[in-house]
Amino acid sequence: MAVSRTLRELAEYLGGTVAGDESKTISGVASLDDAADHQITFLANPRYAPKVATTGAGAVVLPPGGERHGRNAIHVANPYLAFAKLLTLFHVAPRKPQGVMEGALVGHNVAMGSDVTIYPGAFVGDGVTLGDRVTIFPGVVIYEGVTLGSDVTLHSNVVVYQGCRIGNRVTIHAGTIIGSDGFGYAPDGDGFYKIPQLGIVVIEDDVEVGANTTIDRAALAATRIGRGTKIDNLVMIAHNCVIGENCTIVSQVGISGSTKLGRRVTLAGQVGVAGHLEIGDNSMVGAKSGIPGNIPAGSMVSGIPAFNHRDWLRASAVVPKLPELRKTIAELEKRVRELEEKQGA
């Protein structure tokens, strides 16, 4: 059944104030370009402000003092957050629990909470614990002794290795591997001796992990992902790493073993982090950067190797001019030699 709300109701839901017709009914969310009269849109980036005047939306979510150009509007402190909440209200329908469906394989001594759904083709090993409202999609493999909290969703082809622990309200997207062996080998003459990886992975509450990401199990204790952290697709987190709370790790990041991230650290796309390092709280690392050493709390760094972001911007501005500068330096060197030859004559 479609959801519809008046602007007055939406303003109460979002903690905002209405400008215009409070009784206007809204039944969906769309972009500034595509919205129709029954839909609400939002403005979070000032560069798109001119589109407020031309949008076909029935209402616009704006920041405080934002120009509404005669449109119905809801003013809120954080339009982007409001947009997310509106999408949840209008377009995210809760799934009805299906129980253990035919074709699912469930082992012995599995403890299940209420309203669990296990789709056909999923495998749940012996001694697994599933909290309330867990959803396990086709192709998921859960090894023995795993613990999942409540409101956990594992999308198709996720694999969770033995003994790993996943908290409440965690979503893991398709193809991700939790708890595979860490990359540990001891040199043995001309070859290598595999170091058994006996630890686990612990994923705390409110974490989301994207598709095709790998988080390796620790050698002895736990690789840990802190509460509220968001991890994108195609990320590699090696054994023994500890990721702090509310971190953001963007696609194609690689974090080597035993590295620790503090709280609220952001690693942009394709960052590479060496092993046995510490990155302090509230630090930000620019895309494609290489981290060879520790990063103090509150830092903003970029580059290979990474250094202060502002200095990196200045250095990057010089790079396109290097051929011209090289030519200029060569000419200056030639003139200096000529002057020296004249003085010595």
Swiss-Prot record:
InterPro entries linked = Hexapep, Hexapep_transf_CS, LpxD, Trimer_LpxA-like_sf, UDP_GlcNAc_AcTrfase_non-rep
Q: Which Gene3D superfamilies match?
A: Hexapeptide repeat proteins, MurE/MurF, N-terminal domain
EC no. given is 2.3.1.191
- GO biological process terms, semicolon-separated: lipid A biosynthetic process
Q: What's an example of a GO molecular-function annotation for this chain?
A: N-acyltransferase activity
In terms of SUPFAM superfamilies, this protein maps to: Trimeric LpxA-like enzymes
Q: Which pathway is it part of?
A: Bacterial outer membrane biogenesis; LPS lipid A biosynthesis
Does this UniProt record's set of keywords contain Repeat? yes
| Superkingdom in the source lineage | Bacteria
Keywords in alphabetical order, please: Acyltransferase, Lipid A biosynthesis, Lipid biosynthesis, Lipid metabolism, Repeat, Transferase
> Is Lipid metabolism set as a keyword in this record?
yes
Q: Where is the active site?
A: 239 (proton acceptor)
Q: Name one GO cellular component term.
A: membrane
Reactions it catalyzes: a UDP-3-O-[(3R)-3-hydroxyacyl]-alpha-D-glucosamine + a (3R)-hydroxyacyl-[ACP] = a UDP-2-N,3-O-bis[(3R)-3-hydroxyacyl]-alpha-D-glucosamine + holo-[ACP] + H(+)
NCBIfam families linked: lipid_A_lpxD (TIGR01853), PRK00892.1 (NF002060)
Instruction: Note the subunit structure.
Output: Homotrimer.
Family according to the record: Belongs to the transferase hexapeptide repeat family. LpxD subfamily.
- What's this chain's function? Catalyzes the N-acylation of UDP-3-O-acylglucosamine using 3-hydroxyacyl-ACP as the acyl donor. Is involved in the biosynthesis of lipid A, a phosphorylated glycolipid that anchors the lipopolysaccharide to the outer membrane of the cell.
Query: What protein name is recorded for this chain?
Result: UDP-3-O-acylglucosamine N-acyltransferase
Species of origin: Geobacter metallireducens (strain ATCC 53774 / DSM 7210 / GS-15)
